[in-house]
């Protein structure tokens, strides 16, 4: 699947519709359909009471509905379309099955969320690993191999550890992974066992990227996989990244892989609508590509290389401490 296929695949409409279906229930709960039925909902109004306290969730719901043509952006806000008017009339059907039976739907998939994260960490780890294996890992492994690792690889946010194993096997170096989720670390046991069977030295531990306490002087390259956007605000994230210099005193590179928000997209798509909407429900505003680059600079890093990845709105950044020599990209 190419980048274009994420938007043009028939599955894109199914996925985007699933996200928008939940957004319709949320929009109704927040009173958005009633407000839009009266006319344009202006951005300046969303920044005032009664909307302000739910501003991020409101934006997430409106953007999800834009992708299915129920709401459209206008110069200074949002307005309901004919499809949106029809949807508003059918919202009780969505509320009945998606709202009234939400716990039944959730219960069919998993028996409980990870207390540390509030999400089903095992599902996140395994699904992310499968997405990575299909669309990302070969690019990432090639990128890390090009850096000619001279010691241990540390992967922060390693999930099941599958990518870490693949990297370490390719470059013939040991590895260590950290993940906040106990469920993810549990899922990684199988990967660690496989590594031992084939003679690759890797270990996976539970750990918080913002509170690492153990020094790893043998680590040459640190990777941080699709979780930097969870560390906020920017000043705090920059401080966390600076702390890695103490935790990994001999590391030559910090390589960050992450996803940034969509920019005014109105088309059905695989992956991106989920990223944008779920983070809005978590009251999070992931930083933009430009904001990420500025934050890396604030943290004391130079971006040596930026690679656009196959998953929409996703990038790899090869970072080096500013006091090291070499041209920046």
From Swiss-Prot:
Disulfide bonds: none annotated. Its EC number is 2.1.1.47. SUPFAM superfamilies: S-adenosyl-L-methionine-dependent methyltransferases. GO terms for biological process: antibiotic biosynthetic process; methylation. The keyword ATP-binding does not apply. Involved in the biosynthesis of the antibiotic indolmycin, an inhibitor of the bacterial tryptophan-tRNA synthetases. Catalyzes the transfer of a methyl group from S-adenosyl-L-methionine to position 3 of the aliphatic side chain of (indol-3-yl)pyruvate to yield 3-methylindolepyruvate. Pfam families: Methyltransf_25. It is an enzyme of class 2 (transferase). This is Indolepyruvate C-methyltransferase. Keywords: Antibiotic biosynthesis, Methyltransferase, S-adenosyl-L-methionine, Transferase. Disruption phenotype: Cells laking this gene are unable to produce indolmycenate. Belongs to the methyltransferase superfamily. GO terms for molecular function: indolepyruvate C-methyltransferase activity. CDD domains: AdoMet_MTases (cd02440). Signal peptide: none annotated. It catalyses: indole-3-pyruvate + S-adenosyl-L-methionine = (R)-3-(indol-3-yl)-2-oxobutanoate + S-adenosyl-L-homocysteine + H(+). Coiled coil: none annotated. It comes from Streptomyces griseus. The keyword Transferase applies. The gene is ind1. Optimum pH is 7.5-8.5. Loss of methyltransferase activity at pH 5.5 and below.
